[in-house]
Amino acid sequence: MEPIEQQLTELRTTLRHHEYLYHVMDAPEVPDAEYDRLMRELRELESQHPELITPDSPTQRVGAAPLTAFSQIRHEVPMLSLDNVFDEESFLAFNKRVQDRLKSTDDLTYCCELKLDGLAVSILYENGVLMQAATRGDGTTGEDITSNVRTIRTIPLKLHGENIPARLEVRGEVFLPQAGFEKINEEARRTGGKVFANPRNAAAGSLRQLDPRITAKRPLTFFCYGVGVLEGGELPASHSARLQQFKAWGLPVSDRVTLCHTPEEVLTYYRKVEEDRPHLGFDIDGVVIKVDSLALQEQLGFVARAPRWAVAFKFPAQEQMTFVRDVEFQVGRTGAITPVARLEPVHVAGVLVSNATLHNADEIERLGLKIGDKVVIRRAGDVIPQVVNVVLSERPADARDVVFPTHCPVCQSDVERVEGEAVARCTGGLICGAQRKESLKHFVSRRALDVDGMGDKIIDQLVEKEYVHTPADLFRLSAGKLTGLDRMGPKSAQNVVNALEKAKETTFARFLYALGIREVGEATAAALAAHFGTLEALEQASIEELQKVPDVGIVVATHTFNFFAEESNRDVIAQLLAEGVHWPAPVVVKAEEIDSPFAGKTVVLTGSLSQLSRDDAKARLVALGAKVAGSVSKKTDLVIAGEAAGSKLAKAQELGIEVIDEAEMMRLLGE
């Protein structure tokens, strides 16, 4: 190694050491001035020898050119959300569900952490070097924020220590301490810039800057709390031990992580954190409780978009008092009439609130609410403002009754309320402009047909100008017609037309979700698509046949049956197909008809695969007649163990289940 290379390596190592002591251990051993001197020396040497600059150098946190837009990154392992509980009774019910699923009455060890009020991000390290960072996005696809994350000084550009995996994706929260938030807003007021409502918004705005030099000026910080991709290495068998390993590698971890061995200890931890909340120096909105054992986590598995082994125990939402100035009625996608209180604006949990949902007529009656009342407002889950109660002692003499409409406020169609349902609905269907707008917005949304560039304002204009009445009309739009909309130039119009053309190629599950059938969300749409295979089979299914689909009960089955029984809905579907909306035809072959070593077997994949992605491997196995399961049990016939296989492999060996490696799988697949 040349002397200059040796000098650069030593400087970088020294600076990383001091960054680790300062940001992770909170124990700096040199004054800031000495750190700054070392950094200046490194910058000087790198400017003289630019060919020796490395991407993990401490100088490379700042300096990338501004972006014109964020590119998308698909998460190799989905970033799931957590289910919430809001009181001790609900947490104890969660604990009971976990015990019941494990068929055990023994106390569990939980790893308890702060629920930070920031932005969830994933950071990918390859051979210890930071290579990529992304936002959570919709859990499947996020935005590439690598350049911005590199500017956050608490996040190491290079991990240090031994046994670092070849590929390690850590998940965590980027947030803004309250002191930094106040400093940003103080500067914004002084210069006439944007003043943020709360630290979370400020963190989001800082992290999503197209110019990373702006992000670098914001005092963002980070705590890691989990792992996504893991290849070419091993991690400890408990969540808490993994966090300690992360810390040893230089990643920042909250010092409030605590192991609790009984439900009572969890509740004590929750109360203590709630008591300390005002003094932490950063915003949290609860605590996260996770089963500590990775083996038990795998056994518990997931439901829909959340794990069964973890829950967010949210703090009671912050409350304020204000006055109801009026009550208006909004019409949703399925015709639901929702009363909305128009409030005297008031700050609640750092957000200026001027509207609050009243849910339905029963809720108004329960509250005894009148227009003009003084009310208590709560941000439920710190997100959706709600009216909690009426301050009857301060009711003004001129308070007015809330009169629920008998006709739709948008299209004047009759409003009906089905017996047994709390929600009143407009009967206008797609002749109702409000329902039409919301249905179309749902149809083009990211998780449905995902029409890039077609936002809410475009849909509003298309409906108001009567260019579009049904989803099929969207595919008949021309660039010329779109150019007539506000703020829509020829290039933007053509981009929307191109996006519509691209959206015609979809999946059966996305198509079903896009149709907006009542009570049919993404998971149910996927289950229906997998069970019936074709649109024709689903359209002809009886209520009884629909209930044979996993997790489909009488309510969902009835809504689905009624949707396809409605002639106007069938007409819209026919028009969509005529416009070219399509998806791959399923290949359905009975397992007993397949000549394959996997036919009819229940197979579990574990560990990392090098020759196929996990999704590809699953698809190949299913095509050969296998049923691919997520966990090992006595019903498992075969376990395929890739690199760094963990507790699933151990359980398979314990149960005496046949185990093969990836090479043998590829041989049996015919590769």
UniProtKB/Swiss-Prot annotation:
It is an enzyme of class 6 (ligase). The keyword DNA repair applies. This is DNA ligase. Belongs to the NAD-dependent DNA ligase family. LigA subfamily. PANTHER family: CHROMOSOME TRANSMISSION FIDELITY FACTOR 18, DNA LIGASE. One of its GO terms (cellular component) is cytosol. Keywords: DNA damage, DNA repair, DNA replication, Ligase, Magnesium, Manganese, Metal-binding, NAD, Zinc. The active site is at 115 (n6-amp-lysine intermediate). NCBIfam families: dnlj, PRK07956.1. GO terms for molecular function: DNA binding; DNA ligase (NAD+) activity; metal ion binding. Its EC number is 6.5.1.2. The keyword Coiled coil does not apply. It catalyses: NAD(+) + (deoxyribonucleotide)n-3'-hydroxyl + 5'-phospho-(deoxyribonucleotide)m = (deoxyribonucleotide)n+m + AMP + beta-nicotinamide D-nucleotide. It comes from Klebsiella pneumoniae (strain 342). NAD(+) binds at residues 32-36, 81-82, 113, 136, 173, 290, 314. DNA ligase that catalyzes the formation of phosphodiester linkages between 5'-phosphoryl and 3'-hydroxyl groups in double-stranded DNA using NAD as a coenzyme and as the energy source for the reaction. It is essential for DNA replication and repair of damaged DNA. Zn(2+) binds at residues 408, 411, 426, 432.
